[in-house]
Amino acid sequence: IVVIDDNCEALGSTWSKKSLGNQFDMCAWSFDNGKSITTGEGGMITTNNKKFYNYCTQYKDHGHENNPKFPRGRDTHKIYGFNYRVSEIVGAIGLIQLRKLKKVIKNNSIRYKIYEKIIKKFPEVNLRKIPKVRISYVYRNLVQYFKLLL
């Protein structure tokens, strides 16, 4: 069984002092405009497995094998694929955003503490129990549930 980690909202997070994203076979990351860093849309998949890497590389490029013995487009297609290639400009935006990640995580942590302080004043709102780990996106998932008062 191949395990794919959904790390779309956890960029920069840690668990047991280890960065998330390399515990499983593959990891999915999102760079949508609502995430910790953004390129406007899209994301990436990371893996240390050569077979998975080759498959993902082909899949994102219309299924091209990118065989160096043949010109691009004349190589074989063993799988169907789509156009999920990232342009250079989107990649450049991502690199600039990545430089801001530590500051984004720090600001999110400050925001979480402010929200937590305010929300604790309302007994009908239950806060999620957050473990003592670095969570980059936690302020957006603060409330566990509301008690309805009828």
PLM regions and their residue ranges:
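A short helix->loop->beta-strand "cap" motif at the edges of active sites that frequently abuts
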Residues: 1
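Active-site flanking residues adjacent to catalytic metal/cofactor-binding acidic residues
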Residues: 4-5, 87
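Conserved active-site segment immediately N-terminal to the catalytic lysine
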Residues: 5-38, 68-69, 73-78
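PLP-dependent aminotransferase class I/II
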Residues: 14, 50-150
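Active-site PLP attachment segment
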Residues: 22-65, 88
